[in-house]
């Protein structure tokens, strides 16, 4: 009887670990509630940050940055989800084509402003 009990408990633990370890697929930015619920004010804030920081590289492809008009690239990037992209912008990273500086050189920006600037980039690409 004890063996059955321990076998049952072991099975439950294995099922729980398996169920908890599965990673969910990130939501495409364009399909996320956060993107869909952006207000006009959010877009304006994102645009102002883009115009003062992001524009420097993403308008002309400086330092290997992907230009904002490259719809194909941004559509593919949108599949990574906002959290992964936000982390890359917030912390900075070295990509295939160049380096993304932390916060995109907007050192005075807070997390909310950086997030809005990321959404604005996707807003631009979708136009």
Could you describe each region identified by the protein language model?
Residues 2-40, 120-127:
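Post-cleavage N-terminal segment of exported redox proteins
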Residues 24-48, 63-73:
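Electrostatic cytochrome c docking/interface patches
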Residues 47, 56-87:
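Gly/Gly-Pro-rich "capping" loops immediately C-terminal to redox-active cysteine motifs
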């Amino acid at each position: 009887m004890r063996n059955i009990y321990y076998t049952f408990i072991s099975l439950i633990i294995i099922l729980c670990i398996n169920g908890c370890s599965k990673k969910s697929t990130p939501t495409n930015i364009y399909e996320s509630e956060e993107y869909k619920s952006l207000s006009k004010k959010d877009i304006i804030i994102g645009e102002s940050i883009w115009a003062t920081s992001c524009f420097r590289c993403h308008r002309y492809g400086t330092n290997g940055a992907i230009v904002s008009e490259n719809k194909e690239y941004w559509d593919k990037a949108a599949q990574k989800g906002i959290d992964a992209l936000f982390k890359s912008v917030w912390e900075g990273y070295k990509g295939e084509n160049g380096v993304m500086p932390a916060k995109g050189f907007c050192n005075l920006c807070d997390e909310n402003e950086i997030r809005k600037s990321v959404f604005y980039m996707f807003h631009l690409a979708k136009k």
